[in-house]
């Protein structure tokens, strides 16, 4: 048995870490030994930067474009991609079985995951990754500089022996990361660059609610923005509040993101509170103040306007 990508020729044709000017192509695979009823045993999702552009699962046996890519003609031969993913599914699940056999646990519930892909900057290859995990722990990864598979789990030593049984497999893995994957990414960008380079500014609202004890929670919500990077925090008397929790940035489900920050304010605190937002969609920072003159009840909304 050989690595998932190396067991058959690539069915994709040649091509005609992210920072500004960089693009990356990533594949995420998940295999389950005992999936819940109706849940696929194997799933694969491909991403261009942080945007999913096709999905495959073992229930349908089809690779299908998602989001705006479902409207793009000629980007991929989806029947050939489906064939490729079905072959990868079979090999991926065999690897999961081999690991379970090593640990003499052939009936347990286990998860095997893979991530591989590449990045280009200024139209040149600038990075790559290929690694696997078993039950959430690092299992094995490929070092393209050596090149070799590096075991990160006792069972992975056997996997390494199988995957390096012939030297050609190691060289093909290196070639995939350094040549084939970047060329594939360049080809996809011919259909995707305008979508990936777009800038959607956030819509910002502030809500307020009273909590037990009489204090009020101000919530500053930014949503519908792209790209993902955003700075969002509360200020009081021109000082950043360090005590509000970090909320992170979350996908909206439509290719954009949302984030929020909250602050607890006592009725006696009359200082002005501002929510400050920085995003590439704004030419300058957006500052939004809660209007204390409003006759507020629970969940009143203020829509942000640039100042």
From Swiss-Prot:
Protein's UniProt keywords contain Disulfide bond: yes
Main location: secreted
Cell compartment(s), UniProt: Secreted
Alphabetized Pfam families for the sequence: C1-set, MHC_I
Residues recorded with modification Pyrrolidone carboxylic acid: 18
Positions glycosylated per UniProt: 123, 190, 254
Domain of life: Eukaryota
Domain Ig-like C1-type: 202-287
A single GO cellular-component term on record: extracellular space
Signal peptide: 1-17
GO biological process, one term: detection of chemical stimulus involved in sensory perception of bitter taste
Key words, A-Z: Disulfide bond, Glycoprotein, Pyrrolidone carboxylic acid, Secreted, Signal
Protein family (similarity comment): Belongs to the MHC class I family.
Assembly and binders: Interacts with PIP.
Function of the protein: Stimulates lipid degradation in adipocytes and causes the extensive fat losses associated with some advanced cancers.
Protein name per UniProt: Zinc-alpha-2-glycoprotein
Native organism: Mus musculus
């Amino acid at each position: 048995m050989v690595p998932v990508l190396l067991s058959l020729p690539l069915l994709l044709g040649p091509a005609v870490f992210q920072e500004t000017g960089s693009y990356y192509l990533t594949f995420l695979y998940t295999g389950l030994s005992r999936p819940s009823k109706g849940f696929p045993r194997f799933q694969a999702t491909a991403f261009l930067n942080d945007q999913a552009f096709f999905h495959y699962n073992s229930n349908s046996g089809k690779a299908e474009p998602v989001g705006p890519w479902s409207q793009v003609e000629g980007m991929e031969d989806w029947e050939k991609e489906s064939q490729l993913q079905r072959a990868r599914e079979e090999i991926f699940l065999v690897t999961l079985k081999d690991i379970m056999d090593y640990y003499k646990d052939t009936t347990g519930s286990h998860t095997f995951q893979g991530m591989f892909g590449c990045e280009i900057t200024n139209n040149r290859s600038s990075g790559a990754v290929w690694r696997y995990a078993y039950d959430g722990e690092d299992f094995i990864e490929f070092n393209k500089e050596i090149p070799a598979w590096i075991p990160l789990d006792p069972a992975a030593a056997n996997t390494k022996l199988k995957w390096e049984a012939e030297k050609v497999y190691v060289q093909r893995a290196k070639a995939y990361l350094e040549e084939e994957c970047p060329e594939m990414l360049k080809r996809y960008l011919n259909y995707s660059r305008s979508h990936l380079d777009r800038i959607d500014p956030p819509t910002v609202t502030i809500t307020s609610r009273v909590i037990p004890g009489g204090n009020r929670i101000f919530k500053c919500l930014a949503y519908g923005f792209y790209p993902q990077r955003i700075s969002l925090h509360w200020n009081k008397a021109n000082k950043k509040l360090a005590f509000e929790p970090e909320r992170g940035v979350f996908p909206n489900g439509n290719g954009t993101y949302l984030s929020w920050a909250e602050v607890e304010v006592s009725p006696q605190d009359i200082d002005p509170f501002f929510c400050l937002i920085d995003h590439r969609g704004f030419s300058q920072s957006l500052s939004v103040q809660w209007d204390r003159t409003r006759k507020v009840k629970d969940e009143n909304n203020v829509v942000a306007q640039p100042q």
